[in-house]
């Protein structure tokens, strides 16, 4: 059963996250407070919805299936219980989706570009991450991060984001794991073949970081997460670079790859 990684756990003054289909980083360790400066939280009155990535001071990229009404974006967060002095909150001014996205497939062209209502200032805990300049090769070690589940079968979410290293896998691995549905060419297959490390509930929309660039967006994967030979499927950001750059430049009629 495939899970789309988005969340809905309560915020209760502490914010609780979303799942791969909103999932959490399973098998990871608490991130260093300075290693997730580009990581963004999408949240509303119910709690954390998804992750996202700051790509410049005015724009965030996340998963299209993370779209929700009345959400805000939070920058510079580490602990749900202890505020960083440089945390910043913004509203979405505009949201952009691929115009050729299939309405009946929640994870088709699973990318959403968000223009902020005002610029975010770089600070100790806030900085953008570069878009990819070239694709990651099979075997590359990449970083995942988020406030998703740390135990796949239990509603347990961490106070600080967890991080883990996983590998880029051949697309054939994901196609074999999920033979009952299409694994698009515009995605990346990533995980650990033996299982044990994966994005999970509440991690949707967050980054797959390879060589210091946002190469992927958490989209979907196996359920429960972290199972052997059931890696995660990530939107391949490189394939959407032209669309992203066109939208940022003001060409709102730009289309995405088929």
UniProtKB/Swiss-Prot annotation:
SMART domains listed in its UniProt record: Tryp_SPc (SM00020)
InterPro entries from the entry? Peptidase_S1_PA (IPR009003), Peptidase_S1_PA_chymotrypsin (IPR043504), Peptidase_S1A (IPR001314), Trypsin_dom (IPR001254), TRYPSIN_HIS (IPR018114)
Where does the source fall among the domains of life?
Eukaryota
Q: In which tissues is it expressed?
A: Expressed by the venom gland.
Q: Which cysteines are joined by disulfide bonds?
A: 31-163, 50-66, 98-256, 142-210, 174-189, 200-225
Q: How is its activity regulated?
A: Inhibited by PMSF at 2 mM concentration but not by EDTA.
Its principal location?
A: secreted
What are the GO cellular component annotations?
extracellular region; secretory granule
What molecular function terms (GO) are annotated for this protein?
serine-type endopeptidase activity; toxin activity
Q: Which residues form the signal peptide?
A: 1-18
Q: Please give the SUPFAM superfamilies that the UniProt record associates with this protein.
A: Trypsin-like serine proteases
Enzyme nomenclature, EC number? 3.4.21.-
User: Which EC class, in a word?
Assistant: hydrolase
Q: Which residues form the active site?
A: 65 (charge relay system), 110 (charge relay system), 204 (charge relay system)
Its protein name is: Snake venom serine protease 2
């Amino acid at each position: 059963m495939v899970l789309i990684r988005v969340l809905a756990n309560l915020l209760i003054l502490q914010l609780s996250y979303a799942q791969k289909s909103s999932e959490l980083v399973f098998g990871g360790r608490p991130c260093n407070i300075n290693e997730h400066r580009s990581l963004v939280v999408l949240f509303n009155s119910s709690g954390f919805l998804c992750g996202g990535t700051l790509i410049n001071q005015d724009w965030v990229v996340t998963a299209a299936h993370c779209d929700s009404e009345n959400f805000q974006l939070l920058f510079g967060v580490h602990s749900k219980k202890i505020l960083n002095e440089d945390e910043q909150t913004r509203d979405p001014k505009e949201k952009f989706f691929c115009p050729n996205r299939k309405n009946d497939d929640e994870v088709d062209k699973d990318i959403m570009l968000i223009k902020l209502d005002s610029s975010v200032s770089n600070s100790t805990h806030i900085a953008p991450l570069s878009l990819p300049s070239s694709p990651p090769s099979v075997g590359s070690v990449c970083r995942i991060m988020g406030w998703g589940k740390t135990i796949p079968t239990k509603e347990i979410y961490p106070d600080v984001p967890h991080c883990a290293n996983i590998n880029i896998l051949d697309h054939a691995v994901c196609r074999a794991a999920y033979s009952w549905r299409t694994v698009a060419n515009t995605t990346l297959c990533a995980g650990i073949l033996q299982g044990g490390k994966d994005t999970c509930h509440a991690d949707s929309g967050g980054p797959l970081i390879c060589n210091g660039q946002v190469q992927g967006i958490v989209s979907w994967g196996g359920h429960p997460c972290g199972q052997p030979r059931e890696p995660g499927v990530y939107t391949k950001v490189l394939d959407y670079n032209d669309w992203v750059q066109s939208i940022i430049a003001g060409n709102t009629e730009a289309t995405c790859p088929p």
